[in-house]
């Protein structure tokens, strides 16, 4: 929004052209989201307490979690608000990739809000009925995906990029829709599963979003994309603004979500952030890289799949409890130790993912 205003003001003072610089806007997008979060946070936490929007806790979970019962939840509303405001302020709103990303973020946020509200209203951890939850997640993602496919059909925007192989970039055709669907919905649910400890999900999200800011910049630059043997995609550079807004909002939320948490993001935050990361990965054509950089999310999801599969087939559990972060809690690890070690793993995977851009 401010890009258009600055262009108008340039005729009166040339210094306003600094707003057109992507690096300038990306830093301000991060700072705007961060400072807004720090300002809004205490007010939102008080409101959530007044409305009695408290977290429900599983009765079969670790005993240390019982003290979390009643902690304000749905703090993800703060994350969504600050990301949206920051992106609208500093992004080029003529860029369709900005709107695809915001659509999934807010659409998934709305689904998460209903899910959280039902948990609070009925005082259980069930939320939305699973089939309806996946119906709405699927509908939102498919609307965005078909728009993305129509915009980039038969161009580099619908090619498959395979890490380590610079010559393998097949045109996906309609399989793009299938792949994008599983990436967006899958990532959304993976982040949701990871969000079980104070700050556990938000910091890996910040790491991955920060890395995608770099990748979006490279993909939207003709020379850099050519140098790295990745496809040049016209609209991706503006995703840097969206990614840095996520980083700022995430760090601002972590201020209140760090152990012991004053507020939880709830499904309104985790489903939305996961959907946003999946959408970014699809738009910059780095779905495989998301699997690497989001390895903590993958690990959490796989642990649940293995646990459920093992119990159904053998009537035995592999882990003491799934997702796997609860397994380590039940082994006696203090919650902060689990969180920090998972953060370290996430950072290592993100750095390795960035290195693979050159290993081709």
Swiss-Prot record:
It comes from the Bacteria. One of its GO terms (molecular function) is phospho-N-acetylmuramoyl-pentapeptide-transferase activity. Its cofactor is Mg(2+). The keyword Hydrolase does not apply. It catalyses: UDP-N-acetyl-alpha-D-muramoyl-L-alanyl-gamma-D-glutamyl-meso-2,6-diaminopimeloyl-D-alanyl-D-alanine + di-trans,octa-cis-undecaprenyl phosphate = di-trans,octa-cis-undecaprenyl diphospho-N-acetyl-alpha-D-muramoyl-L-alanyl-D-glutamyl-meso-2,6-diaminopimeloyl-D-alanyl-D-alanine + UMP. Its main location: membrane. InterPro entries: Glycosyl_transferase_4, PNAcMuramoyl-5peptid_Trfase, PNAcMuramoyl-5peptid_Trfase_CS. Keywords: Cell cycle, Cell division, Cell inner membrane, Cell membrane, Cell shape, Cell wall biogenesis/degradation, Magnesium, Membrane, Metal-binding, Peptidoglycan synthesis, Transferase, Transmembrane, Transmembrane helix. It is found in: Cell inner membrane. GO terms for biological process: cell division; cell wall organization; peptidoglycan biosynthetic process; regulation of cell shape. It is a multi-pass membrane protein. It holds the Pfam family Glycos_transf_4. Its EC number is 2.7.8.13. Pathway: Cell wall biogenesis; peptidoglycan biosynthesis. GO terms for cellular component: plasma membrane. The chain crosses the membrane at residues 21-41, 73-93, 94-114, 132-152, 168-188, 199-219, 239-259, 263-283, 288-308, 338-358. The keyword Transferase applies. Belongs to the glycosyltransferase 4 family. MraY subfamily. Catalyzes the initial step of the lipid cycle reactions in the biosynthesis of the cell wall peptidoglycan: transfers peptidoglycan precursor phospho-MurNAc-pentapeptide from UDP-MurNAc-pentapeptide onto the lipid carrier undecaprenyl phosphate, yielding undecaprenyl-pyrophosphoryl-MurNAc-pentapeptide, known as lipid I. HAMAP family: MraY. This is Phospho-N-acetylmuramoyl-pentapeptide-transferase.
